[in-house]
Amino acid sequence: MNKEERAKRQSKIRNFSIIAHIDHGKSTLADRILEKTNALTQREMKAQLLDSMDLERERGITIKLNAVQLNYKAKDGEEYILHLIDTPGHVDFTYEVSRSLAACEGAILVVDAAQGIEAQTLANVYLALDNNLEILPVINKIDLPSADPERVRQEVEDVIGLDASEAVLASAKAGIGIEEILEQIVEKVPAPAGDSEEPLQCMIFDSLYDPYRGVIAYIRVVNGTVKVGDKVRMMATGKEFEVTEVGVFTPKTTQRDELTVGDVGFLAASIKNVGDTRVGDTITHAKRPAAEPLAGYRKLNPMVFCGLYPIDSARYNDLRDALEKLELNDSALEFEPETSQALGFGFRCGFLGLLHMEIIQERIEREFKIDLITTAPSVIYKVYLTNGEDVIVDNPSNMPDPQSIDRVEEPFVKASIMVPNDYVGAVMEICQGKRGTFIDMQYLDETRVTLTYEIPLSEIVYDFFDQLKSNTKGYASFDYELIGYKPSKLVKMDILLNNEQVDALSFIVHRDSAYDRGKVIVEKLKELIPRQQFEVPIQATIGNKVVARSTIKAMRKNVLAKCYGGDISRKRKLLDKQKESKKRMKSVGSVEVPQEAFMAVLKMDDN
C-alpha cells in the first residue's frame, strides 16, 4: 500500500474494548457483534466464542484478553475495520484489562439493567479514563423482568458522571440494539493517531507459545509499518529477530503482508526463548529504531504467594516448564525454586489474588497433567530487626527468630464494597472480624451503599470474598487496591508433629487470634492424620511456647489375646514389652502428612 491508501485505511479503523463487571453480559455481547459483522459462519459460532480456554467456558468468566478484527459496513455506506479487544471483569485480572485498554481508543461500558453499577464496573471505568478513552455506555439485559433501564441510566450519570442520554438500550442475548452499538462505535470512537512513515513502534500486549512457530506476540501498531522479512528489535531486551509472519485474528489467525498504524494483530519471528518477548515491551525496526519505547504498563506486583510442589518429585522439571510457558502469556505470575523438608523440591509462586492462584493451579493440572500440592497462601511482610536491619518475608518459614524482631509490618488494602442496604450490617461484621478499619460509607441511591474499609491483605487472601458473597446472597461486589504497609502484632506459628516441625504447615497470624487459630488447626490435623502404631502429639507453637496441643492415640494390638486366665505377672510382662516397642518406634518413626492436611490449614475459617 502507498501512503494515501494507508492514511485512508487508518481513518476507517476503530479500536475498542468492552468493559463490565462479571456477569453483566460482556462475552455474549462480543458474540453478537461477531455475528452481526459476519465474522463467522453459523457453523463456527458457539457461545462465548472469545473465551477460548476450557476453564473460561466452564466457570463462565473471561480470564485472558482476546483480540479480533471485524469488517463492518456502516449506514453511511463506508466499510470500517473494527478491532474488538475482549477483557476480563474479575478484580484479579485487572492487569489484563489495563493491557487491553492501552491498545484501544474507545470502550463500551456494559451495565446490567437490573443490577446497575457494581464495584468492578467503576474500577474498570477509571482505568479507561486514565487511558483517555471515549466511553460509550450500553445498558444490557433490558429484556429481564427486573430491568429498570431509566434508573440505571441515572446511576451512570450520577455515579460515573458520563452523559448517558444516548446510552444504547440492548439485550445481547436477544440481539437487540447491536446495530446501534456498532453505529456509535463508528461515529464516536476516534480513528487511531500515528504515522505510517515514522519509525516502527508496536506494543506487545500479550504473547503465546506455539511449539512450531516459537513465541507469537500479540501487537498493536502505534507508528510505522511492519512486514514479513523485516529485522525487528525488542526495545527492553535489545534482542533482534527476523519477522516470519504477521497477521490478524478474524477470530482465526489470518496471515497478512503487512501491519500498519492502528492494526491489532500478531507477529511471529522464530523467537525460541520465552523471556525475549515481554508483555508491555515495544518492537521497533533494527535498522531505523524508534527514539524511545512506548509507555508500557505498570508491572503488576504479585500480592499472594504460595508454594507449588509436584506430588511426584520426579516431575519437578516438568513443573518448571509449565510455569515458564504460563508466565509467557500471564505477565503477573512470578516464581522461584524453593525446597521444603516436608514436600521436597518445588516453587514459590506469586499471584495477583486467590482466583488467579486457583486458575494457574488448575491450568497446570489440566494442560500439563501435573498433580500439585499447594501450601497456604501468604503475603509479603516487612520485618524490622532489633539490630536495625530489615528483611522481606514471603514465606512463613523464613521468619526471623522472635527475639530479634523489633516490629512487623503487613500490607493493607483499601476495600470498596458495594452492597444493598439490607446487608450493610452483615458486611460490617465480616470486615470487623477481618481486623478491618471503617473509613467511609456513601449511599449511591435509596437501595445501595458503598462501604470503604482498610483491611490487612492477609485477611482478604483466605476467604473474604466467599464470606462476602454468602452473607449477602451474592449481591455484594468488591474491589481493592493496595495502600501500603502498617505495623501489626504478628507472630509465626509452627506446627510440630511428633516433636518435629513441619515447615510447610507454618503460617503467620495476628497475636490476638493465635490461640484460637492454633486450637482449630491442631484439632483439624488430629482428624486428618491417620493413626500410627505409636501416639503422635500435635502441637501449635509460637517461638518455644506451646499454645495448643492434641494427641493422636496409638493403634495397639491386643497382646493378651493368647493368655486364657493366666497369671497377672505374665500379662504384665507382655504389656511392658509392648510399651517398650512403642517407645522405640516413637523415637524412630516418622509421620506421613496427607495432602488434605495442608489444605485444612488454608480452609481455616470453615467452622
Curated annotation (Swiss-Prot):
UniProt keyword terms in alphabetical order: Cell membrane, GTP-binding, Hydrolase, Membrane, Nucleotide-binding, Protein biosynthesis
Stored CDD domains: EF4_II, EF4_III, LepA, lepA_C
A GO BP annotation: positive regulation of translation
An annotated GO cellular component: plasma membrane
Record family assignment: Belongs to the TRAFAC class translation factor GTPase superfamily. Classic translation factor GTPase family. LepA subfamily.
Record function comment: Required for accurate and efficient protein synthesis under certain stress conditions. May act as a fidelity factor of the translation reaction, by catalyzing a one-codon backward translocation of tRNAs on improperly translocated ribosomes. Back-translocation proceeds from a post-translocation (POST) complex to a pre-translocation (PRE) complex, thus giving elongation factor G a second chance to translocate the tRNAs correctly. Binds to ribosomes in a GTP-dependent manner.
Protein's recorded name: Elongation factor 4
Organism: Bacillus cereus (strain ATCC 14579 / DSM 31 / CCUG 7414 / JCM 2152 / NBRC 15305 / NCIMB 9373 / NCTC 2599 / NRRL B-3711)
